[in-house]
Each structure stands twice: as structure tokens, then as C-alpha cells.
Swiss-Prot record:
Organism expressing this protein natively: Influenza A virus (strain A/Goose/Guangdong/1/1996 H5N1 genotype Gs/Gd)
Sites of Phosphoserine modification: S64, S82
Assembly notes: Homotetramer; composed of two disulfide-linked dimers held together by non-covalent interactions. May interact with matrix protein 1.
Lipid addition sites, S-palmitoyl cysteine: C50
Residues on Virion surface side: 1-22
Notes concerning its domains: Cytoplasmic tail plays an important role in virion assembly and morphogenesis.
Function: Forms a proton-selective ion channel that is necessary for the efficient release of the viral genome during virus entry. After attaching to the cell surface, the virion enters the cell by endocytosis. Acidification of the endosome triggers M2 ion channel activity.
Localization in the cell: Virion membrane; Host apical cell membrane
Annotated site residue numbers, Essential for channel activity, possibly by being protonated during channel activation, and by forming the channel gate and the selective filter: H37
Name of the molecule in the record: Matrix protein 2
Length: 97
């Protein structure tokens, strides 16, 4: 019996769905997949900025500064900053970590 042939019958307190296939493993699996899909979609919409920012920028780190003296690190930061400074009134956002 397909889901389109379900019959709803009024009872004393509520509407009840008479469906003989509700214990079918395929129906149970489809219900579980549907619920998981809904949960994942809601989480994606709530945290999409965090998730996609992590995927976009989290995997692309700058050059490693391990073992480099602090003076050279500061010099590198200043070079990077001066390379993007524009005197035309344009603004450039730089994220230094």
C-alpha cells in the first residue's frame, strides 16, 4: 500500500492514520533519513557562516612563523601591510593571525 492511499478516520479524540505499512523497513529508513536531513539543514542554516569560513580560511594558513625571530615576524607583517596600503581612499581588510 502506498502512502497516497492512507485513510484518515475521525476518532473520539483525534485524527488517526490507518496505514498497514508503517512497520515496513523502507518507510522507517526513509523517515530516519528525512529527520536527519532536516536536522542537518537546520544546523547548516544556523552555523553556515562558521562552517564555510572555517572551510574557506581554515585550510589556507599563511606561511609558518615557527622558529622565526619576533623581529622578522614584525618586519614581515609591516611589509604585508605596506603592500596593500592604498592612498586612493580605498579600504582593504587584512586578517593577521
Amino acid at each position: 500500500m502506498s502512502l497516497l492511499t492512507e485513510v484518515e478516520t475521525p476518532t473520539k479524540n483525534e485524527w488517526e492514520c490507518k496505514c498497514s505499512d508503517s512497520s515496513d523497513p523502507l518507510v522507517v529508513a526513509a523517515s530516519i533519513i528525512g529527520i536527519l536531513h532536516l536536522i542537518l539543514w537546520i544546523l547548516d542554516r544556523l552555523f553556515f557562516k562558521c562552517i564555510y569560513r572555517r572551510l574557506k580560511y581554515g585550510l589556507k594558513r599563511g606561511p609558518s612563523t615557527e622558529g622565526v625571530p619576533e623581529s622578522m615576524r614584525e618586519e614581515y607583517r609591516q611589509e604585508q601591510q605596506s603592500a596593500v596600503d592604498v592612498d586612493d581612499g580605498h579600504f582593504v581588510n587584512i586578517e593577521l593571525e
